[in-house]
Amino acid sequence: MELTTRTLPARKHIALVAHDHCKQMLMNWVERHQPLLEKHVLYATGTTGNLIQRATGLEVNAMLSGPMGGDQQVGALISEGKIDVLIFFWDPLNAVPHDPDVKALLRLATVWNIPVATNVATADFIIQSPHFNDPVDILIPDYQRYLAERLK
């Protein structure tokens, strides 16, 4: 597939997702980085988003809870170019009923080449990057060219 460039803005749109056993870990991470995160636009699956809002006062655009379709809503936003970074603390030791949604979310983040953190160390690397508060160019699939080729 041909690629094109997308510029991630200085003010990032960040999705925050956590499985039940990882929610407290994500909450701690958000609280530790609240001064940086408040400069960006935050999205989250339902329970996670509401817990973050309650604990920090940060404004969070909450989707549905993950098992009710929230993971798919975040994935749709990624496909539409509306999410720039995904912080997803998932529990590799416990299966969840919506595992296919989880796999689809991670697949879309990879397809659309956005930065993804699935653990605290990687999330710290992303947020501490010297480029985190700057516009950054990424390569993404050239969907218009892809569609034009398919419609020939």
UniProtKB/Swiss-Prot annotation:
The keyword Lyase applies. One of its GO terms (cellular component) is cytosol. One of its GO terms (biological process) is methylglyoxal biosynthetic process. SMART domains: MGS. CDD domains: MGS. Keywords: Lyase. Its EC number is 4.2.3.3. It catalyses: dihydroxyacetone phosphate = methylglyoxal + phosphate. It comes from the Bacteria. HAMAP family: Methylglyoxal_synth. Catalyzes the formation of methylglyoxal from dihydroxyacetone phosphate. The keyword Membrane does not apply. Signal peptide: none annotated. The active site is at D71. Residues 6-152 form the MGS-like domain. One of its GO terms (molecular function) is methylglyoxal synthase activity. Gene3D superfamilies: Methylglyoxal synthase-like domain. Belongs to the methylglyoxal synthase family. Substrate binds at H19, K23, T45, G46, T47, T48, S65, G66, H98. InterPro entries: Methylgl_synth, Methylglyoxal_synth_AS, MGS-like_dom, MGS-like_dom_sf. This is Methylglyoxal synthase. PROSITE patterns: METHYLGLYOXAL_SYNTH (PS01335), MGS (PS51855).
